[in-house]
Amino acid sequence: MENYSSNKDTYIKRMNQTAKSKFAVVESFLSKGIKILDFGSGISPEFISDIDSSGAEYYAYDISKTVQTELASMGVNVVTKEDLTNKEVQFDVIYLSSVFHEIISYLSPQERTETIAMIMNNLKPGGYLVIRDWANPNDNFLQIKIKPVSKQAEREMNTWIKELQRNSIIDQNCYKLVDGSISASYANAYEIIFHTVWGLKSLSRESKEQYNVENGIKKWIINPWEKELNLQTVYYETDETYLPHLQKYFKLDEVPFETKSIHIFQKNK
């Protein structure tokens, strides 16, 4: 949450830019009396307002004390880790939006297990676990060419590649071509493109984050919880608003990959 602390206005603006697409994913589950937990919520006033307008009861959980304080000052129902450990409230919907990749990027295996168990223990029988996150195609065979728009963009891209490889986010299936572009597997290209667009100011933080969530969802949710959870649907979205940001770095006519994956699970009754 360093971004929030250092530049509150920019942080909230960024959160609000994606609020409508974030809300659309869970809108059909919401009605009067439904309790929804925004797990790893951050601060998104527009999203909170949309939830309130649906008649559902909004609860937020975030590990940042700064975020907790800000949310409480807004009158939001803030849930603590202690509340979740003690199962103070049972939820009809638990929503992880752009959070699961952080769980698999930063938490130890033991912490991941404990976190997922905590989520499951606070989900009502028949309730829904909704995971909205990156959509890396996880394809290590198909190749794509990535061409930077300038020498500066090329240098920044190469800096990201170096750090992503150092942090084991991408492998060596990435080759420099004579024109300054690179050829990379779809899995690597996804990481390179969507990391580079953050800019070098975010290098130290974002270069540690894994955007390939498919394997993580299978390993940490589907396999260990197969007797308690049923995967209802998986679908993908492409956010075209990424294009102008990507075009600052790469020669692209369209967003080359789907940007979000949505996994919807239902807990057995």
Located regions from the model:
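A conserved beta-strand element that flanks and buttresses the S-adenosyl-L-methionine
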Residues: 95
